[in-house]
């Protein structure tokens, strides 16, 4: 599959304390990209898709405890 001109590659890493939230973050990221390490994914998507992914992840995490880069 070839990339679209407006797609970019993003490296997304996370540190999530709670097992349930961690599983949800991994499942969400897995639906957008490929796992390259336990807490690191490569996502190739458009800016609009990245914003949708970001909104989904923000709804999952506890911002005081977790981080996503």
Each language-model region and where it sits:
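Basic nucleic-acid-binding interfaces
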Residues: 1-11, 17-69
